[in-house]
Amino acid sequence: MKHLIIFLLFPFLGAAQPIISCTDVIKPYADFESPLAFEETVVALQKELNSRGITIFATIDHQKAAEAVGESMQPATVLIVGNPKVGTALMQENPRFAIELPLKILIYEEEKTVNIRYEKIAAIA
């Protein structure tokens, strides 16, 4: 009988817990507004990353991919980036880091504003 009461009350106990946004806990991001146009932002960011010795492993143009299947969307590009020397050291210390690397940077346009978003390193450390 005791187990039946606990089982019946369990859904209500969960409702008493504070609501926490998953995005705050799981994926805290840094967001910035770019003063440049979309393409200028992508090029400037690529140049800056290269000047700092950061490898750009891939550039994914989501708008172009959408157009390839007959769809349209706002400009959005993801840069897959990293520094193999730093990444290797992190993965040697903790192999689970491999799921988070390489890092991703999103450049997107929303309501005529160009934004840059990336995951804070502290969130995965």
Specify the residue positions occupied by each region the protein language model found.
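Beta-strand/loop substructures that line and gate deep hydrophobic ligand-binding cavities in soluble
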Residues: 104-125
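Compact, glycine-rich, soluble single-domain proteins
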Residues: 46, 50-103, 107
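Sec-dependent N-terminal signal peptides
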Residues: 3-13
